[in-house]
Regions:
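Key residue(s) within conserved catalytic/signature motifs
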Residues: 1-182
Length: 182
């Protein structure tokens, strides 16, 4: 399969996203939310922006409209991809254990909210460490379908990327107005 059609337009948006990537390469991560109606090109814009940031590694996660999706599905995808690229094989077991146990893996002396916060911090620290070398673009696609735990963790990560080499590109669908055409 060859490259897609040439990307045209959206110069202002690409410049803004390139600025985020440049800042992340210097240790000032950032977040971009890309929203719009279905089919408007949100994913293509995010893909193009990520491809134009060759100094940063890229990882993609996509939410799916499936109620059977496991909790933290977006981050299971991200951690799986990041671990293949950034951590040695001997650490794979620890990663799999973390994913299998989730928030319940924390000491029993913590209440559920404290356990969740500890896991969120661990995920942010893990991704920040993985991005410390080359930097990292994390593309979260179709988050309108994300499970609630993934959304909480994504918000936590977004609030803490400022001092990292991480760029979060988050695409989401804005529903068309009911009964209207635009």
């Amino acid at each position: 399969m060859g490259p897609g059609p040439e990307f045209v337009g959206r110069a202002a948006e690409l410049a803004l996203l390139a600025g985020l990537a440049d800042a992340a390469a210097l240790g000032e991560g950032g977040v971009a939310l890309i929203g719009g109606e279905p089919g408007i090109g949100k994913t293509r814009l995010a893909d193009e922006a990520a491809a134009r940031a060759p100094c940063l590694a890229r990882v993609r996660a996509r939410a799916v409209p499936d109620e059977g999706c496991p909790p933290y599905w977006l981050f299971r995808q991200v951690i799986g991809e990041v671990s293949k690229t950034f951590i040695p094989n001997e650490l794979q077991h620890a990663r799999l254990s973390f994913l299998a146990q989730g928030p319940q893996a924390q000491p029993a002396r913590l209440d559920l909210a404290e356990q969740r916060f500890a896991v969120f911090e661990a995920v942010r620290d893990y991704l920040t460490a993985a991005a410390a070398g080359s930097g990292l673009v994390l593309l979260f696609d179709d988050v309108q379908w994300a499970d609630p735990p993934s959304l909480r963790l994504l918000r936590h990560l977004a609030e803490g990327v400022a001092g990292s080499r991480i760029v979060l590109l988050i695409t989401y669908r804005i529903p068309r107005p009911a009964g209207g055409t635009s």
